[in-house]
Amino acid sequence: MTHAIEVCGLTKSFRADRKALDDVTLHVAPGEMVALLGASGSGKSTLLRHIAGFVTSDAGAGEIVVNGRAVQRHGRLARNVRSVRSEIGFVFQQFNLVGRLPVMTNVLVGMLSRLPKWRSLLRLFKANEIQAGLHALAQVGIDDYAFQRASTLSGGQQQRAAIARTLVQNARVILADEPIASLDPESSRRVMSLLAQINRTRQVAVVVSLHQVDVAMRYCPRVVALRHGKVVYDGPSAALTPDMLRDLYGTEAEELLHDTLDSEPDAVPVPALAGMNIAAA
């Protein structure tokens, strides 16, 4: 079986005496939802950025393949890495939206890799492409804000716009780097529910980095726990207990156990598209 994500023997050193990632091996199946769990500095974000091909591993140390195509090998990016990246949606902690541009423009950026170069440079989108953007925004519940500046949205709404961008991109893999770290509990539930919904309905592989154990257990059937750049647990989230976490993390376990979401996740509304008028060049 071709895995959605294959990471083999990945090592990354930022200093001679410290490995941010230490011989990490990870396989994620298509349609699987996995939580990367760990305290601050455990290597979660570094691992996701390597999978996306934003950074390279140490020379001669590791290989990453996404959807059967190489992202990097032995510290060098693959020649066609841009093409591979077009199938990887990345949701950043700080949203990565351009505040002065409309929400719609920020979302449609997700399809730039599929457009002719001249239209990509000029940001010219056809009516059917804008329709796809509206549909994606409707799926995340913020289509009413499509033509407002992104800076007018709340943090939770901006994160949902970032998720809509991955839908327009038709990403086969979604990597979410601490997507709820700066959000209130209600917005956090909405964002995690959206990621879980996309995972179920589209069978997209989702890997989300978290530092809250209860969130990982609620939304992700599988947890990969990192500590000091090493994988210290890879298995069912339901098997994690406070005592096990204290054994794995020592005093760092309190950071993972402290933050919680207070109530059950709410259903995410999906507004209908009927009656919408679209203007496009």
Swiss-Prot record:
UniProt-annotated location(s): Cell inner membrane
Superkingdom as given in the UniProt entry: Bacteria
Keyword Heme: no
EC numbers, comma separated: 7.3.2.2
Chain residues that bind ATP: G38, A39, S40, G41, S42, G43, K44, S45
Keyword Cytoplasm part of the UniProt annotation: no
GO CC annotations on file: plasma membrane
Domain ABC transporter: 5-253
Any one Pfam family match given in the protein's UniProt record, by short name: ABC_tran
PANTHER family in alphabetical order: AMINO ACID IMPORT ATP-BINDING PROTEIN, PHOSPHONATES IMPORT ATP-BINDING PROTEIN PHNC
Chain's role: Part of the ABC transporter complex PhnCDE involved in phosphonates import. Responsible for energy coupling to the transport system.
Subunit and interaction comment: The complex is composed of two ATP-binding proteins (PhnC), two transmembrane proteins (PhnE) and a solute-binding protein (PhnD).
Protein name stated in the entry: Phosphonates import ATP-binding protein PhnC
Organism: Cupriavidus pinatubonensis (strain JMP 134 / LMG 1197) (Cupriavidus necator (strain JMP 134))
Lineage: Bacteria, Pseudomonadati, Pseudomonadota, Betaproteobacteria, Burkholderiales
